[in-house]
């Protein structure tokens, strides 16, 4: 929740996700504050996979639409966005790990940040209690990246120095998981829900819990769907 993992899509995979964020202090369903400033917004991401991370290298191409809600008739749906690429490899026989590199925004338009987000990341799958009935399947992730993973110091100084990010997620019920992460400048935590037998997933949480970043604490609601053709 709040950071990328080293896992990704493969050939014939297609995915789409929609996210909603709202200022924590203003409330979950407050779109504009008393000064008519936008304090909530939606975003969208969609793309497709190629290759095979088990046999060779897998990859995905994704497009991100930054804003779905206009501000004074400007910066509405599709006005700002990015397109990027991710390459990833699975190593099931080597501690069940995955590795990936990504450049999330080589293509930018509108008010998208001009700083490049490039990262390398490793994720490891494991079970907290492998011999128990309730195994608590887990995913541990650690990476280094620029752009959205910069420290607050780098953001204030307008530099693009690399920074460390990481997170941990655990399945606490058959269809419920909990995850927490540090994205380089903010602490995030949330729950993942998979209520159906088809790949429609939801996550609900709070980003920047400690209000360490410039955005402050925000509610986050995300839904994603993927399929193979």
Model-found features: residue ranges?
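A short, structural micro-pattern
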Residues: 95, 114-116, 136
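Glycine-rich phosphate-binding "P-loop"
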Residues: 135-165
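Feature captures outer-membrane beta-barrel proteins of Gram-negative bacteria and organelles
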Residues: 42-54, 79-93, 116-131, 142, ...
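Transmembrane beta-barrel domains of Gram-negative outer membranes and organellar outer membranes
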Residues: 1-109, 127-129, 191-193
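Transmembrane beta-barrel strands of outer-membrane/channel proteins
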Residues: 18-22, 61-67, 101-105, 140-146, ...
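Extracellular loop and loop/strand-boundary signature of outer-membrane beta-barrel proteins
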Residues: 107, 152-154, 209
């Amino acid at each position: 929740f709040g950071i990328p993992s080293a896992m990704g899509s493969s050939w014939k995979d297609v995915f789409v996700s929609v996210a909603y964020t709202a200022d924590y202090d203003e409330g979950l369903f407050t779109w504009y504050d008393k000064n008519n400033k936008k304090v909530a917004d939606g975003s969208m991401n969609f793309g497709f996979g190629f290759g095979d991370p088990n046999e060779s290298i897998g990859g995905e191409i994704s497009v991100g639409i930054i804003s779905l809600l206009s501000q004074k008739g400007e910066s509405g749906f599709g006005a700002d966005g990015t397109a990027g690429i991710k390459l990833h490899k699975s190593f099931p026989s080597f501690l069940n790990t995955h590795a990936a590199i990504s450049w999330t925004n080589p293509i930018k338009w509108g008010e998208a940040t001009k700083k490049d987000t490039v990262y390398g990341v490793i994720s490891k799958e494991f079970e907290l209690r492998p011999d128990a009935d309730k195994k608590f399947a887990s995913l541990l992730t650690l990476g280094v990246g620029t752009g959205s993973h910069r420290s607050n110091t780098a953001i204030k100084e307008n530099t693009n120095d690399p920074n460390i990010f990481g997170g941990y997620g655990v399945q606490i019920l058959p269809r419920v998981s909990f995850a927490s992460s540090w994205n380089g400048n903010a602490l995030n935590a949330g729950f993942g829900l998979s209520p159906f037998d088809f790949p429609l997933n939801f996550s609900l949480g709070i980003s920047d819990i400690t209000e360490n970043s410039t955005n402050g604490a925000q509610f986050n609601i995300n839904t994603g769907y993927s399929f193979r053709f």
